[in-house]
Amino acid sequence: MDYLDSINRALNAVTYPSEPQGLYEPIAYALSMGGKRLRPTLVLLACAIYRNDPEVAMPAALAIETYHNHTLLHDDLMDHADMRRGKPTVHVKWNENTAVLSGDTMLIAAFRHLIDTNCPNKERMLSL
């Protein structure tokens, strides 16, 4: 299994509402910037150790990648970073308020991905 390709395909398949565009477009932009995707890959690898099909852990992998990118939106703003992975940061391309709100929305999206995870301890996991 090509984990990076699977993760990128799954991220690209996530749909967000079309409105308000100013809130959701920056999320798609941030998640499309690429990266190593180390965290979601580790989630899938850990699942592969215990189960035959690591795809069952894809919602958890998407959750951790979405959460990580939410922190990057806020971090770029706090650090006044102009570029991320060779592209303008969200607060530069849009504005600071959009970066904060889109980052907060990504946190909610991460929890939604966790809700989609099919695991026996989901309630316990979400209570943390």
Role assignments for model-derived ranges:
Residues M1-T15:
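N-terminal amphipathic/basic leader segments beginning at the initiator methionine
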Residues N12, Y16-L128:
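Mg2+-dependent prenyl diphosphate-binding active-site environment of isoprenoid biosynthetic enzymes
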